[in-house]
Curated annotation (Swiss-Prot):
Locations listed in the record: Cytoplasm; Nucleus
Protein name (Swiss-Prot/TrEMBL): Uncharacterized protein C4G3.03
Domain of life: Eukaryota
Disulfide links within the chain: none
Any one GO cellular component localisation term in the record: nucleus
Entry-linked Pfam families: DUF2415
Keywords: Cytoplasm, Nucleus
Length: 347
């Protein structure tokens, strides 16, 4: 099913139509890789948003607008960034992979000589150890044991790989690369990966991001040809829903997608962002979405030409954040309304 309906009543999801602005200079070092902000629960009074600028990783606390540098400067300009499971990790153009542990220890690894396009972090069910999945241009996903700083194994593919996501229960993984193919892996009790299905997103182009829903029922694939494919894990042959962005590629290429985080409660939302100016908040109960448009930052340029360098939910699902070159924009979710009327049958 392909739909392109827009929800005219933003109050279905949002408390504010005009976003708050926070000072954060975010930059991308690759025109296709624009998934460069992230957050996680740190146990602090408010959780930071991580972002990259040049060879540095920063974190901003939106409540106070305090900005802090994470660790030392890197030896590379990051293409990928993620904060999860207590870790913060960044990947580079020549196989570099740096991460900070929960104790702030910084580790540097050289994994290959190709781009590290995407990072996923999860804890294994077998021993609760944290491991990273790094999607690379050498046709592999590398599995790194973050507890010991060791490359544990490599999964091999027929194309450059761009992104992977692990389900919240740790039982399966989906990944995508420079083709329409979507690879579905089972993760067994010992932590090993087994390819179970290969399906195709509703695209003829490369895909750059994946996300798995809160209850592990759905997963989404964001593609370069301006399409977003949503699959039901029980029916992998074809997508159950396809959304198209507001414009054709390259401006309308979808560069990131994120389901409501596990700590957010039953909000049933999916955030996805184009490469320029427009993000969308999809209501999974109705299939309708709300456009989130970046405000004009420069009177000499069209608002439709502003780069988006990443988007994410707050860890508790209370807000969504979208990053431009100069600001982090925040829209607040109407959580009370969403949770008061939850849905147990999506779409």
């Amino acid at each position: 099913m392909t739909v392109d309906n827009r929800c005219s009543n933003s109050s279905l999801c949002l408390r504010n139509v005009t976003p708050k602005q926070h000072p954060a200079r975010v930059c991308s070092n690759h025109w296709q890789l624009k998934n460069l902000i992230s957050t996680q629960n740190t146990g602090e009074e408010s959780n930071p948003i991580y972002y990259t600028n040049s060879v540095f990783v920063w974190k901003i606390y939106p409540n106070s607008e305090k900005v802090v540098q994470v660790g030392q400067g890197l030896s590379f300009k990051p293409l990928s960034l993620l904060g999860k499971c207590g870790y913060i990790a960044a990947g580079g153009q020549l196989g570099e992979f740096d991460y900070w542990s929960p104790t702030s220890k910084q580790t540097h690894m050289k994994l290959c000589d190709q781009h590290n396009n995407g990072i996923e972090i999860h804890r294994r069910n077998c021993d609760s150890h944290a491991e990273a999945l790094i999607s690379s241009n050498d046709h592999t996903i590398k599995v790194v044991d973050l507890e010991h700083g060791l490359l544990r194994k490599q999964l091999h593919f027929p194309v450059n790989m761009n992104h992977a996501s692990v389900s919240n229960d740790g039982r399966f993984m989906v990944c995508v690369g420079d083709s329409p193919q979507v690879f579905f892996y089972e993760i067994d009790r010992s932590g090993e990966y087994h390819l179970r299905h290969t399906t195709v997103a509703d695209t003829t182009d490369s895909s750059f991001c994946t996300s798995i829903s809160q209850r592990n029922e759905l997963f989404a694939v964001a593609s370069q040809d301006s399409s977003l494919s949503v699959f039901d894990v029980r029916y992998l042959r074809t997508p159950m829903l396809t959304k198209t962005s507001s414009r054709p590629d390259p401006n309308g290429s979808i560069r990131s997608c994120h389901f409501t985080p596990p700590n957010g409660g039953p909000l049933d939302l999916l955030l996805y962002s184009e490469g320029f100016s427009y993000s969308h908040l999809l209501d999974l109960r109705t299939g309708k979405d709300v456009e989130l448009v970046l405000p004009s930052e420069d009177r000499f340029f069209s608002p439709a030409s502003q780069d988006i360098f990443g988007s994410c939910f707050a860890d508790d699902g209370s807000s969504v954040y979208v990053a431009s070159a100069t600001h982090l924009y925040e829209w607040n979710i109407d959580k009370r309304s969403r949770i008061c009327f939850p849905s147990y049958q999506l779409l």
